């Protein structure tokens, strides 16, 4: 293989590389065997056409595209490695020449990782809007949340108030015509929860079981159903039940209901204080780490960050998000309909975060390189065991999912983050 690289602009260039016949011939054989079973020729059973007959009838050139797809990935990676390039986006491949019996020549337009000029990243002084302190009010608030979670809904003989739950039937119409999705039966609605269109819940305050209420609202201009956006609607609403929350007394019995490992309310407060202090400590450390990394990135200069890196990160984030949606049974079409957004809106939503994440990774990688951080065998093994514990899977499965290079990269990145944060101080 012969390779060359022509620089076209900052972080951009063209690789030219060749593929030898000793690689091409086996690929042509594979391409032929792939289609052989479907070939017919007079005098031969289906799937038994000899290669010379095929070449004479169709020409060997018809196999070139499939053969190229077989040999290209390995040949391209070998060229990148030989040239010592750090390519960061999908290449644009072009065929320069593909002649029978000769080596093939291809070109690849590539984008390379930008130069990072590091600034200060050690002994940084940062400000954080976080505290390690836990107050009595914090403990009481946590207990109150648990107390509210244990509340029971009981039938209320009287008017509905904010915070009460009403069980309703409703039928919505616009200009006297009912619309899809505007009807519900025995729907439980907590007043003040904001589940329904603004103004809907407020008009049920004061209603009693058995009442029929005409609720008049206007759909927001940004409503996901475009045919309803900005339109006035009427909902004929029947109140079946009014329910109110009955919360348990704040006493030792409540404490035992919340946590079976405590005997008194005071025990629960002590336990919750320890939990909150641990959580606050973690949140504080995370805030310091985030602020220090952000400052280290701000102190660095990234020379001509390629847009392709941002686009790839946005696409990765969007694909991950939509994959999570589909695992919950929500298709892309359904998501965009429910949210009233578009594919472009979703990409724009992730763009700013993608830009920040790409720059952060580049700077941390540059710090790891500047410090000469590498991973030892024992550190790799420890990382595998830690991941196995975190994701509750066998260590061998982790090894099969992650390459040694990926693990080495992650460990070096962690060491770089550690050198930033361990030397940082809070103003």
Swiss-Prot record:
Write down the Pfam families for this protein, in alphabetical order: FKBP_C, Trigger_C, Trigger_N
Reaction(s) catalysed (UniProt annotation) = [protein]-peptidylproline (omega=180) = [protein]-peptidylproline (omega=0)
The terms describing its cellular component in GO are: cytoplasm
Q: Which GO terms describe its biological process?
A: 'de novo' cotranslational protein folding; cell division; chaperone-mediated protein folding; protein transport; protein unfolding
What InterPro entries would the database entry show? Answer: PPIase_dom_sf (IPR046357), PPIase_FKBP_dom (IPR001179), Trig_fac (IPR005215), Trigger_fac_C (IPR008880), Trigger_fac_C_sf (IPR037041), Trigger_fac_ribosome-bd_bac (IPR008881), Trigger_fac_ribosome-bd_sf (IPR036611), Trigger_fact/SurA_dom_sf (IPR027304)
Q: What class of enzyme is it?
A: isomerase
Protein name, entry field: Trigger factor
Function recorded in the entry: Involved in protein export. Acts as a chaperone by maintaining the newly synthesized protein in an open conformation. Functions as a peptidyl-prolyl cis-trans isomerase.
Tell me where on the tree of life, at the top rank, the source sits: Bacteria
Which Gene Ontology terms cover its molecular function? peptidyl-prolyl cis-trans isomerase activity; protein folding chaperone; ribosome binding
Q: What is its main location?
A: cytoplasm
* Subcellular compartments: Cytoplasm
List UniProt keywords, sorted A-Z: Cell cycle, Cell division, Chaperone, Cytoplasm, Isomerase, Rotamase
Similarity section = Belongs to the FKBP-type PPIase family. Tig subfamily.
Annotated ranges, domain PPIase FKBP-type: 163-248
Q: Might you give the EC number(s) for this enzyme?
A: 5.2.1.8
The domain-related comment in the record is: Consists of 3 domains; the N-terminus binds the ribosome, the middle domain has PPIase activity, while the C-terminus has intrinsic chaperone activity on its own.
Xref: HAMAP family: Trigger_factor_Tig
């Amino acid at each position: 293989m012969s390779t060359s690289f022509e620089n076209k602009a900052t972080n951009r260039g063209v690789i030219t590389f060749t593929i030898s016949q000793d690689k091409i011939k086996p690929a042509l054989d594979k391409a032929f065997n792939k289609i052989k079973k479907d070939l017919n020729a007079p005098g031969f059973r289906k799937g038994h056409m000899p290669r010379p007959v095929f070449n004479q009838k169709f020409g060997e050139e018809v196999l070139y595209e499939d053969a190229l797809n077989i040999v290209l990935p390995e040949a391209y990676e070998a060229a990148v490695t030989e040239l010592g390039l750090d390519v960061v986006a999908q290449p644009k491949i072009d065929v320069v020449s593909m002649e029978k019996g000769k080596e093939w020549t291809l070109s690849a337009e590539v984008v390379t990782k930008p130069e990072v000029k590091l600034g200060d990243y050690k002994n940084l002084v940062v400000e954080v809007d976080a505290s390690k302190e836990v107050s009595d009010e914090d403990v009481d608030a946590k207990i109150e949340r648990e107390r509210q979670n244990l509340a029971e809904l009981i039938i209320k003989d009287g008017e509905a108030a904010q915070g009460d739950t009403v069980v309703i039937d409703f039928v919505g119409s616009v200009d006297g015509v009912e619309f899809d999705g505007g009807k519900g039966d025995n729907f439980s609605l907590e007043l003040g929860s904001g589940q329904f269109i603004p103004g809907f819940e407020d008009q049920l305050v004061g209603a009693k079981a058995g009442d029929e209420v005409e609720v008049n609202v206007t759909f927001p201009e940004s409503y996901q159903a475009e045919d309803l956006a900005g339109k006035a609607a009427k909902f004929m609403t029947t109140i079946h039940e009014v329910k109110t929350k009955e919360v348990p007394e704040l006493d030792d019995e409540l404490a035992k209901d919340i946590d079976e490992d405590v005997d008194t309310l005071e025990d629960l407060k002590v336990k919750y204080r320890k939990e909150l202090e641990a959580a606050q400590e973690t949140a504080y450390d995370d805030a310091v780490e985030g602020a220090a990394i952000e400052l280290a990135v701000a102190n660095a200069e990234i020379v001509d960050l390629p847009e392709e890196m941002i686009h790839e990160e946005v696409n990765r984030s969007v694909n991950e998000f939509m994959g999570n949606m589909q695992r919950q049974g929500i298709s892309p079409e359904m998501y965009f309909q429910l949210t009233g957004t578009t594919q472009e809106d979703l990409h724009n939503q992730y763009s700013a975060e993608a830009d920040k994440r790409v720059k952060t990774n580049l700077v941390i990688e540059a710090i790891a390189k500047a410090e000469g951080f590498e991973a030892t065998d024992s550190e790799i093994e420890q990382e595998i065991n830690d991941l196995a514990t975190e994701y509750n899977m066998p260590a061998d499965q982790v090894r099969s999912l992650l390459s040694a290079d990926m693990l080495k990269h992650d460990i070096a990145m962690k060491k770089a983050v550690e050198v930033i944060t361990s030397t940082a101080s809070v103003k």
